[in-house]
């Protein structure tokens, strides 16, 4: 959520930022609402002052034995008017709040301007594209013989669900454990196992609600939602709290199942394991000092990159342009892994600094040594990594002509020493 004072005092700054995001939001609607709110508060204050004076006059007249009926009648009318205006004020305040929580974050000054993914800016790349003496296959061609069962997943539930057997299941488990070990042992993250269901307030805290409800799975006759990412529960762990400055930065990591309706993805990635309604992801969340969050963003990105480097997977990093960033982000880097079967790069991690946007919504503050009162800290999040997409990248990059897949060396201890996945299926 944006700072109300920023909107009131510098509406042109917010309008310019929203224009960069191509949000289509008209700032004058807020200005009119906020002006009406101020007018109501002034009018109520004036009426209450008048009522107080009239109450004093009634008391004085009664002490003097004078008839105060007319003034008492006026007092009743004033009270009725105040009651009406108070109700209208609350309605307008609620409208202002709803308008506020529908606004996206303001892009950082370093974010390139642009309309969509075509305007994202290349930052750097690591590694080389693998070479093959055969035409590399896509993962949905290799996968079934190694345990990716799209047919049974569809039969059990529906489209965009997959059953993992044997090598595929072992590889998913190995990747998850490997990611968590690197984060906790090498980068100082604390592992957390959060609920997979959260309430509406929690979803609002990180920005999924109210704007993106259609992207979520909600339990019928309940206020609970299935989480689309562990970012949601991890960030809200400190909602309503004041975190001591000396504890910053705080770093959490979690592996969870994630659930997304993919409402806006009709026709995209209908084949394979790239875009699922249910998938495993390891998430990184950091809570930072307000003046150090962009330094923390570079750390966060490097922690995601290290995983791809250890796996020997070629990737590139792009800075998202203003029109392609997520709702809560002030700046985002995307890590895109190379998939030789598809002959393209695919996103495998997004690392974002949300500045004080989520902290303001979830009321997460810190008490700085030189501040008189607590201030909102900054929150950051990133995929470390999307497990299913990493599995896809391994299948496509390490495939052999006979359909087998070489296991990256760092994963072999997690696979019981297995170095080669042989096509034993379909199962």
Swiss-Prot record:
Entry binding sites for ATP: 260-262, 347-350
Q: Cellular component terms, GO, for this chain's entry?
A: cytoplasm
Protein task? Catalyzes the attachment of serine to tRNA(Ser). Is also able to aminoacylate tRNA(Sec) with serine, to form the misacylated tRNA L-seryl-tRNA(Sec), which will be further converted into selenocysteinyl-tRNA(Sec).
Say which species the protein is native to.
Oleidesulfovibrio alaskensis (strain ATCC BAA-1058 / DSM 17464 / G20)
Q: What is the official name of this protein in its record?
A: Serine--tRNA ligase
Q: Which UniProt keywords apply?
A: Aminoacyl-tRNA synthetase, ATP-binding, Cytoplasm, Ligase, Nucleotide-binding, Protein biosynthesis
Task: Share what the entry says about its subunit structure, partners included.
Answer: Homodimer. The tRNA molecule binds across the dimer.
What does the sequence similarity comment in the record state about its family? Belongs to the class-II aminoacyl-tRNA synthetase family. Type-1 seryl-tRNA synthetase subfamily.
Which residues does the annotation say bind L-serine? 229-231, 283, 383
Q: PANTHER family annotated for this entry? A: SERINE--TRNA LIGASE (PTHR43697:SF1), SERYL-TRNA SYNTHETASE (PTHR43697)
Where located?
Cytoplasm
């Amino acid at each position: 959520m944006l700072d109300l004072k920023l909107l009131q005092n510098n509406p042109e700054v917010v309008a310019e930022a929203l224009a960069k995001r191509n949000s289509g939001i008209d700032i004058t609607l807020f200005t009119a609402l906020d002006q009406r709110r101020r007018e109501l508060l002034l009018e109520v204050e004036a009426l209450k002052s008048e009522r107080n004076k009239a109450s004093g006059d009634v008391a004085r007249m009664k002490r003097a034995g004078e008839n105060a009926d007319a003034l008492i009648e006026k007092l009743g009318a004033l009270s009725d008017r105040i009651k009406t205006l108070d109700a209208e004020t609350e309605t307008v305040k609620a409208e202002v709040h709803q308008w506020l929580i529908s606004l996206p974050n303001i892009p950082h000054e370093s974010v390139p301007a642009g309309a969509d993914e075509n305007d994202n800016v290349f930052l750097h790349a690591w590694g080389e594209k693998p070479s093959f003496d055969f035409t590399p296959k896509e993962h949905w061609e290799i996968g079934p013989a190694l345990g990716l069962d799209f047919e049974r997943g569809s039969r059990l539930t529906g489209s965009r669900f997959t059953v993992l057997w044997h090598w595929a299941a072992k590889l998913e488990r190995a990747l998850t454990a490997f990611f968590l070990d690197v984060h906790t042992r090498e980068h100082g993250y604390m592992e957390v196992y959060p609920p997979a269901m959260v309430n509406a307030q929690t979803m609002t805290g990180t920005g999924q609600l109210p704007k993106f409800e259609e992207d979520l799975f909600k339990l019928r006759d309940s206020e609970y939602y299935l989480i689309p990412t562990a970012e949601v529960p991890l960030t809200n762990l400190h909602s309503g709290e004041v975190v001591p400055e000396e504890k910053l930065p705080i770093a959490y990591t979690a592996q969870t199942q994630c659930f997304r309706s993919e409402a806006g993805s009709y026709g995209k990635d209908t084949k394979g394991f790239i875009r699922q309604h249910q998938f495993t992801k390891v998430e990184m969340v950091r809570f930072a000092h307000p003046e150090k969050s962009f330094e923390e963003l570079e750390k966060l990105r490097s922690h995601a990159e290290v995983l791809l480097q250890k796996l020997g997977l070629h990737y590139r990093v792009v800075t998202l342009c203003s029109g392609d960033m997520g709702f809560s982000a002030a700046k985002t880097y995307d890590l895109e892994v190379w998939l030789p079967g598809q002959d393209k790069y695919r996103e495998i991690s997004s690392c974002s600094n949300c500045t004080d946007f989520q902290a303001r919504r979830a009321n997460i503050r810190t008490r700085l040594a030189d501040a008189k009162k607590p201030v909102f800290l900054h929150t950051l999040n990133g995929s470390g990594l999307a497990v299913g997409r990493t599995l896809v990248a391994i299948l496509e990059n390490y495939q052999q002509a006979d359909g087998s897949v070489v296991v990256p060396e760092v994963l072999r201890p997690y696979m019981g020493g297995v170095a080669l996945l042989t096509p034993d299926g379909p199962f």
